[in-house]
């Protein structure tokens, strides 16, 4: 099933916009309201699975934390394994780490060293694309382990914050269900 305009509008309307959160001047797009609606949540997963079902994906990677909520069901729908990428010291086995820039400092993400095998074709899934820093770090981790990643899927794309362009420079094609301006 290809996403219809009516389905995408339904998803967009299921996402609440919160003014002045987490600070004044920010319009926060709250994907948790989509999760509260089982029809919207199921539709978002179905549309992503449909898009990638014939893409030869062997693993789905989701970034902490809301990427888990969308990545794991997409992996199940595709019949492949799910790999979490987490904040430091949250994964029990041997990991590798990648640092990335935040607005005021840096952060790190980790992945198990045995979670991705050389040649795995990986789809990265997250709830929202803003500047692309988190996904760029995730892609670097996957590639360091020998995985091939060319696509990333999102529920929301804050299209004017530059994430899609940033990831395109890394050879990543981005797909999102719901575009919003990112003011």
Swiss-Prot record:
Catalytic activity: AMP + diphosphate = 5-phospho-alpha-D-ribose 1-diphosphate + adenine
SUPFAM superfamilies reported in the protein's UniProt record: PRTase-like
EC numbers, comma separated: 2.4.2.7
Keywords associated with the record: Cytoplasm, Glycosyltransferase, Purine salvage, Transferase
UniProt-listed Pfam families: Pribosyltran
Protein task: Catalyzes a salvage reaction resulting in the formation of AMP, that is energically less costly than de novo synthesis.
Protein's name according to its UniProt entry: Adenine phosphoribosyltransferase
Provenance organism: Citrobacter koseri (strain ATCC BAA-895 / CDC 4225-83 / SGSC4696)
């Amino acid at each position: 099933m290809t996403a219809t305009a009516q389905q995408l509008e339904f998803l967009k309307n299921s996402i609440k916009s919160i003014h002045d959160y987490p600070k004044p001047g920010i319009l926060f797009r709250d994907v948790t309201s989509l999760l509260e609606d089982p029809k919207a949540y199921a539709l978002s997963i179905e549309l992503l699975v449909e898009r990638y079902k014939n893409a030869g994906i062997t693993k789905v990677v989701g970034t902490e934390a809301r990427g888990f909520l969308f990545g794991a069901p997409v992996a199940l729908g595709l019949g492949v394994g799910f790999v979490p990428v987490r904040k430091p010291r949250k994964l029990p086995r041997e990991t590798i780490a990648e640092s990335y820039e935040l607005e005021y400092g840096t952060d790190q993400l980790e992945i198990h060293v045995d979670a991705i095998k050389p040649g795995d074709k990986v789809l990265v899934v997250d709830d929202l694309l803003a500047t692309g820093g988190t996904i760029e770090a995730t892609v670097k981790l996957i590639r360091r382990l020998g995985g091939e990643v060319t696509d990333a899927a999102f529920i929301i794309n804050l299209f004017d914050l530059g994430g899609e362009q940033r990831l395109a420079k890394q050879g990543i094609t981005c797909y999102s269900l719901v575009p919003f301006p990112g003011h």
